[in-house]
Amino acid sequence: MDNTQAEPLVVAIVPKPNASTEHTNSHLIPVTRSKIVVHRRDFPQDFIFGAGGSAYQCEGAYNEGNRGPSIWDTFTQRSPAKISDGSNGNQAINCYHMYKEDIKIMKQTGLESYRFSISWSRVLPGGRLAAGVNKDGVKFYHDFIDELLANGIKPSVTLFHWDLPQALEDEYGGFLSHRIVDDFCEYAEFCFWEFGDKIKYWTTFNEPHTFAVNGYALGEFAPGRGGKGDEGDPAIEPYVVTHNILLAHKAAVEEYRNKFQKCQEGEIGIVLNSMWMEPLSDVQADIDAQKRALDFMLGWFLEPLTTGDYPKSMRELVKGRLPKFSADDSEKLKGCYDFIGMNYYTATYVTNAVKSNSEKLSYETDDQVTKTFERNQKPIGHALYGGWQHVVPWGLYKLLVYTKETYHVPVLYVTESGMVEENKTKILLSEARRDAERTDYHQKHLASVRDAIDDGVNVKGYFVWSFFDNFEWNLGYICRYGIIHVDYKSFERYPKESAIWYKNFIAGKSTTSPAKRRREEAQVELVKRQKT
């Protein structure tokens, strides 16, 4: 590993807005950039630097150890055409068999915490206790957690990362039924009993917005409803699914707080995701569109957890298709978390959309907003592979400030932040490990987090997505997010330059950026050639 000492990289972030800025004026937060040097010492001593992965994306061993099938097993195997390369997570990156080696790499990289999910169908193959507990699956997670702890890495556990047991989907439609609330609560309680004395950070759901929209409005994720298919109703089902997720979250948090939190001394929250929505112009209609867009993505979940009901804009536009909370549920939802995890990848411009004349209603058009990555023919940020992600570090800053000011969230973690790149299969390993752009990405986003902290947002951790290259849902293996390169055929792991940077950053060392180092090496080589 290269531990060359050098001047730290200078990156650009947004300046601090006026502390009195109201959330209704979030579009006024300036985006002019200033320069700042990012160090480990800029963050609080108890700030956690980690990385993440999830069960279906990493474990593999889909039919080993008495694991039951999940909806992602069914989706990928029955509908391979919906995956970009026709692949699946049957083997994923083989973490089930390689976890000890993987955790050794985590320790070498200096991770302070690793965020992972439990496969519901690996511990409860039939989805509930009455259908039987899988002792092999329970042992695997005990061994995995124990190995993390033995290596000084804090486990951060997600209970649901989209891989619902197929048994519950078959029995009653999974999250389309209110019955899921009791079954999820039972599963959560089982995990609290089984693993809770070792876990200090619990997350009920990861990105419920993605699960509800991609799985029930677009048909691109399991269980594949909505979209162009005949199954599902994209005007109703995403709202029903989200409603049941919120009630299941509430039930699990109540269970943890009432029975476990005092003795286990852990925290429990939920991980949400949102793009930052920037008004396309200063016209009031676009400013209003910004608020609606944020309501429909972030407020859909945070408003009930703050006020006990959905955003006013959603009530007005979705009307009777939006479920209602009982008075008791509404009251108990308020403050039903210890922390909020925020997954951030990109930002977009938004403008007011003309109401669709289409007779087919959908969540996708209910907000009456048009999104675009360009303004005056200039992109909002550098476009990455696939075109959906643009590098917009200041969007993370604005999102954190907006979340704190609008919803008064006391504790935030950036639970995912990462950069997509193409899986280039015909390049040398040495080239595949060169990812200076990823290092630059994380430097700039960490700078935005630091600036948000300076402005009073209580951010307590940053988790790189992802630690390993892995199976990326409907994109299969055509792209990579990891700071550790994985050979998808041999499963060999190799640290990328970004992993070496992250190791040194966490350790508080100054490092030459990979791009700068290569420029210096090229300059030395040029001088040598000139002398000869």
Swiss-Prot record:
User: Which tissues carry this protein?
Assistant: Mainly expressed, at low levels, in roots and, to a lower level, in leaves.
Give the record's GO biological process terms.
alkaloid biosynthetic process; carbohydrate metabolic process
Q: Which InterPro entries match?
A: Glyco_hydro_1 (IPR001360), Glyco_hydro_1_N_CS (IPR033132), Glycoside_hydrolase_SF (IPR017853)
Against Pfam families, the record matches this protein to:
Glyco_hydro_1 (PF00232)
- What EC number(s) has UniProt assigned to this enzyme? 3.2.1.105
Catalytically driven reaction(s): 3alpha(S)-strictosidine + H2O = strictosidine aglycone + D-glucose
What happens on changing residue 416 to D/Q?
A: Loss of activity
Task: Cite the effect that the entry attributes to residue 161 to L/N.
Answer: Loss of activity
Region feature Disordered, mapped onto this chain: 512-532
Q: Which domain of life is it from?
A: Eukaryota
Question: What SUPFAM superfamilies is this protein classified in?
Answer: (Trans)glycosidases (SSF51445)
| Known pathway | Alkaloid biosynthesis; ajmaline biosynthesis
Q: How is it used?
A: Ajmaline is an anti-arrhythmic alkaloid commercially used as an efficient drug for the treatment of arrhythmic heart disorder.
Tell me, in a sentence or two, what this protein's role is. Glucosidase specifically involved in alkaloid biosynthesis leading to the accumulation of several alkaloids, including ajmaline, an important plant-derived pharmaceutical used in the therapy of heart disorders.
Question: Which protein family is it in?
Answer: Belongs to the glycosyl hydrolase 1 family.
The protein's name in its UniProt record:
Strictosidine-O-beta-D-glucosidase
